[in-house]
Amino acid sequence: MKANIHPDYHTIKVVMTDGTEYMTRSTWGKEGDTMNLDIDPTTHPAWTGGSQTLLDRGGRVTKFKNRFGNLGI
């Protein structure tokens, strides 16, 4: 492996949406940083069977519904 071309690989704390915390190694941030997740396997519709409501991040879902909601498809 070539020296000085790879990003720093260090330990960070990840906090899931339910408050569960765990330590992992990552190239994100710097040593000891905390990553707070907005969506994780316990809240993502792909893993929960779509039973939870979809987050409207930045109004994209609302914009889509306003534009195409009255097509009646």
Curated annotation (Swiss-Prot):
HAMAP family: Ribosomal_bL31_1. This is Large ribosomal subunit protein bL31. Gene3D superfamilies: Ribosomal protein L31. Binds the 23S rRNA. Keywords: Ribonucleoprotein, Ribosomal protein, RNA-binding, rRNA-binding. Part of the 50S ribosomal subunit. It comes from the Bacteria. Disulfide bonds: none annotated. One of its GO terms (biological process) is translation. Pfam families: Ribosomal_L31. One of its GO terms (molecular function) is rRNA binding. PANTHER family: 50S RIBOSOMAL PROTEIN L31, CHLOROPLASTIC (PTHR33280), LARGE RIBOSOMAL SUBUNIT PROTEIN BL31A (PTHR33280:SF6). It comes from Brucella anthropi (strain ATCC 49188 / DSM 6882 / CCUG 24695 / JCM 21032 / LMG 3331 / NBRC 15819 / NCTC 12168 / Alc 37). PROSITE patterns: RIBOSOMAL_L31. InterPro entries: Ribosomal_bL28/bL31-like_sf (IPR034704), Ribosomal_bL31 (IPR002150), Ribosomal_bL31_A (IPR027491), Ribosomal_bL31_sf (IPR042105). GO terms for cellular component: ribonucleoprotein complex; ribosome. Belongs to the bacterial ribosomal protein bL31 family. Type A subfamily.
